[in-house]
A protein has these predicted regions:
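Conserved helicase NTPase motor core
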Residues: 1-76, 91-95
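Short, ordered loop/turn segments at secondary-structure junctions
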Residues: 188
Length: 188
């Protein structure tokens, strides 16, 4: 693995480490919650001895555990760099208050996280609907019924569907096409 070899080289060859440390006066890491322990150690070595390290991340948004990412890196950073200033961006400008509050209640159940209370910039909303489905077929039926109702009410343009995989998008495209519901598919 390239990262392991890189880490090994930086640990064992002090001249190499010094050369690379001299290359970077400042280091910025975005999406820090998605780095692995090996990547954390590489960044830590490169940032030394100046420790001019700027990280951006949200431990509640870590989604790459299957790739070795560890949101605990956020907590470790606060321990390893006690002099670092922490700036909390605690206002959500994308979603209305009902969504932010519901998400906050779900996320609060995470056992290992940095404490934070996110507020919504947009107060008014139409609430959220929660469906509990026994299986995929029931999910498709309920969602399709909701979309058809939105279409009848002339509000289909307010709807969006986010799928985790391209395969799921393909299945939903077939369902929507079969029901006569117009849609546009985009990546990202």
């Amino acid at each position: 693995d390239l990262m392991l070899l890189c880490l090994e080289m930086l640990r064992e060859d002090s001249a190499c480490l010094k050369r690379w440390q001299a290359q970077f006066r400042y280091i910025l890491v975005d999406e820090f919650q998605d780095i692995s322990p090996v990547q954390y150690e590489i960044v830590r070595l490169l940032a030394a001895p100046e420790n001019n390290l700027f990280i951006v991340g949200d431990d509640d948004q870590s989604i790459y555990g299957f790739r070795g990412a560890s949101p605990e890196s956020m907590m470790r950073f606060l321990t390893d760099y006690r002099a670092a200033e922490q700036i909390l961006l605690d206002v959500n400008y994308r979603c209305h208050e009902d969504i932010v509050n519901a998400a906050g209640r779900v996320i609060a159940e995470n056992r290992n996280r940095l404490e934070k209370n996110i507020l919504a910039a947009h107060r008014e909303g139409e609430g959220i609907a929660l469906y509990t489905c026994a299986n995929e077929e029931e999910l498709r039926k309920n969602l399709l019924e909701s979309l058809l109702q939105e279409q009848r009410n002339g509000r289909l343009t307010r709807c969006a569907m986010i799928c985790r995989t391209n395969f799921a998008c393909g299945l939903w495209a077939q369902v929507l096409h079969g029901a006569g519901i117009p849609y546009v598919m985009r990546e990202k």
